[in-house]
C-alpha cells in the first residue's frame, strides 16, 4: 500500500486546520500513521483510494470530515481551444488518451515533489506499473499546440528527460533508467507512442519518459497533462491529477481529443456521476437507523452531494470523478458509516453461545495443501477474476455458458470469474520465466460454475521432461493419501494433446481431468517447455 509523506506546512495550509487536530482525526478516514516526524508525517492509505495519494487529496477529504468545507467539490473547467489529434496507428499501440491544461500554478519545491509523487503512486495504484495508465506533466512554455499523438518508428530520435544528447526510442529503452525499467510494456511492438507539438517538438514517449524540453521547474505556471493507457482508468487518473492541482489554485482547461474517424472527446470531464442508494441498504448494512438529515450530513462530510428522492426511500448521490473506489451502493454506505463514526455504532453480544469448529471444506483445503507441499509443489494464490482471452482463447477452448461475467469490468484482464484454475497456473509460469526449471505449482481455490462456488485443487509442472506419467504419479499420491479410489478414462479436450488427456472418475462420476498441454496452448502463453497438470473438484 502507498505511504504518503505529508509536510505539515502544506497540510495545514490546504486543510485550514492545525497539525495536531489533523493527526488525531486522519486515522478515522481509513489511514494508518506510519511515522510522525518534526516536519512531516508518513501515512499509509488503502490502494482503493488513489484520490488520497497526495497532500491535496488528503486535505480535501479532511476539510469535509472536520466540517470545515462539506459537500461536493466543484472544479470549473473552461475550454482551452487546444486540441490533440490521434494517429490511425496509435490504436494498435496505446489507444486511450486524456489531456488537460492547468494554468496559474505557483510551484514550490515541495509542491513539485508532491505532484511527482502523486504521478508515480498513480502509476502503481491505477496504472499497474504504467501498463494500464501513464501520466505526463509538461511545462507549456516551450511548446506550441495543437498536439499530435502518433505511433512512430523505434529509430525516431529525441532528447529524453535527464539526458543531453538525442537518442533513438530503442536506445531509450536500452540505456535510460526509466526505459530499462518499463521496456517490457512495449515489448514486441513495431511502433512506439509519441506526443509532439505543432512544430514536431517531443513532449512525451509514453509510458516511458518525457522529453527534456518540458521539464517542470519552480518557475512553471502552466501545465499540459497527458494520460495514456488502455482503458477508462486513464480518465480517472486525469481527474485525480487536475483536481489536486486545482486545490493549489490552478485553473483547469479542457483539451479536445480528435480521433482518426473525426469523433471528438473533451477531457477532463469533471461532471459527477449519480448513484441511487435505497435506505434499506443503508439501514441493514450499518445496523442502525439514521435520519435523512444525518445520512445527508455524513455524505457531505465525505465530499458527496446528496438528496432524498420524492418516494422518501431512495437517496440520490453525486459522486466526484476522482473517486475511483465507488463501484457499488455498498461503497457509499461504507462512507456514511465512516462519516458517522464506527465508534458510535454499538456492538451487541450474541443471544446464544456456541462452540465453533473448522468447516469440512476448510479441513479438506488444509489437508490438500499439506499433501501437495510434501510432493514438492509450491502454493500460489492468483486472482479468481480472469479474462476470456486467458481462460478460453489461449487454452484453445470454446466459451461455455456456465461462466459468470463481471457486469462493469474496470480492466480487460478481469472480465469473468474463473471456472477452472489451470489457466491461472500456466499464466504464472509465463510470468516466472526468469526462474529456473522445473517449476511445480498448485492452488486449492474457488471457482464459480453456473453461478455456484466450487472448491478445486489444480497442479501443474513445467520442464523439458514433463509427461503424463509424472502428473499421474502425483495424482496417485494425492488420492492414496485421501484413501480415494479412482479411475481415469481417455477423453478429448483441445487444450491437451490427443491421447494424453483423461477424465478423473470417482464412483463413476467425473471429478476432474489431467494431461499434457497442447503445444499451441503452451506457445499462446509465451512458453516453450512441456506442461502437465491436473484439476479435481473437492466440493463434494
Swiss-Prot record:
Where does it reside?
Cytoplasm
Record's subunit section: Tetramer of two alpha and two beta subunits.
Q: Which cofactor does it need?
A: Mg(2+)
Question: What is the protein's name according to its record?
Answer: Phenylalanine--tRNA ligase beta subunit
Biological process (GO) annotations held by this record are: phenylalanyl-tRNA aminoacylation
Signal peptide annotation: none
Q: Which reaction does it catalyse?
A: tRNA(Phe) + L-phenylalanine + ATP = L-phenylalanyl-tRNA(Phe) + AMP + diphosphate + H(+)
